[in-house]
Every structure is written in structure tokens, then in C-alpha cells.
């Protein structure tokens, strides 16, 4: 109890010293939670910083969207190229098959002519 009363006296006594000399103000520890002021107006630097951050985020979003769009476009172009190459290859095979078929038909005709000529003798 005596300790408690001594502390109360120290708290009450603090004021201007008897000598009149001014001492440094006794500071309390910084408590960040108490310092936060809601709805306070931002300084010009904080506004600039916030705007810069928003611009940067916006640019990143735009860049990501552009990359996504470009990737989709590249995929479509690649599919188109593959389709055209496949079609060209198929046409080449068809031309070869037609040519081979014609050669085979010619061979058969020659054989038939030969056989016919042999039969007529």
C-alpha cells in the first residue's frame, strides 16, 4: 500500500521543478495501434504513392490481359498452320495416288492389248 501511495505522489508531483529548470518531457512508448487515425486525409506524397501503385497494378493487369489475348491468337494461328499443312500433305498424297493409279491403269491396258494381240494370232 505504501508503494502504491508513493507512485501516486510521484505522478502528482511531476510538474515544474523547484529550481525552475525545464526538463525533457517524459515520452511514452510508441503504440502504433493507437496512432492509426481512421478517415484521415492523405498527404500529397501519400496520394502520389497510392496513385503510382494503382497505375502499376493497372498496367500489370493490362499486360496480363494482352499476353493472354496474344497467347490465344497464337494458338489459333498455330492450329490454322497445322490444318493447312495437313491439307497440303493430303492433297500431295491424293495427287500421288492419282498418278500411281493412272500408271497402274496404263500397265493393265498394255497387258490387255498384249493379251488381245496374242489371242488374235
From Swiss-Prot:
- Keywords assigned by UniProt? Coiled coil, Nucleus, Ribosome biogenesis, rRNA processing
Coiled coil ranges (UniProt) are: 48-104
Q: What are the disulfide bonds?
A: none
Primary site of residence: nucleus
Q: Which GO terms describe its cellular component?
A: nucleolus
- Identify the InterPro entries for this entry: Cgr1-like
The superkingdom of the source organism is Eukaryota
What GO terms describe the biological role, i.e. biological process, of this protein? Answer: rRNA processing
Per UniProt, subcellular location reads as: Nucleus, Nucleolus
> Which family is this protein grouped under?
Belongs to the CGR1 family.
Role played: Involved in nucleolar integrity and required for processing of the pre-rRNA for the 60S ribosome subunit.
Q: What is the designated name of this protein?
A: rRNA-processing protein CGR1
Amino acid at each position: 500500500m505504501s508503494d502504491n501511495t508513493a507512485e501516486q505522489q510521484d505522478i502528482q508531483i511531476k510538474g515544474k521543478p523547484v529550481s525552475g529548470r525545464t526538463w525533457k518531457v517524459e515520452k511514452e512508448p510508441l503504440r502504433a495501434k493507437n496512432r492509426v487515425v481512421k478517415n484521415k486525409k492523405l498527404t500529397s506524397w501519400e496520394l502520389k504513392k497510392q496513385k503510382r501503385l494503382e497505375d502499376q497494378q493497372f498496367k500489370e493487369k493490362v499486360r496480363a490481359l494482352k499476353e493472354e489475348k496474344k497467347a490465344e491468337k497464337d494458338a489459333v494461328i498455330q492450329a490454322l498452320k497445322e490444318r493447312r499443312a495437313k491439307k497440303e500433305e493430303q492433297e500431295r498424297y491424293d495427287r500421288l495416288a492419282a498418278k500411281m493409279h493412272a500408271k497402274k491403269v496404263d500397265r493393265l491396258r498394255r497387258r490387255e492389248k498384249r493379251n488381245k494381240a496374242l489371242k488374235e494370232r
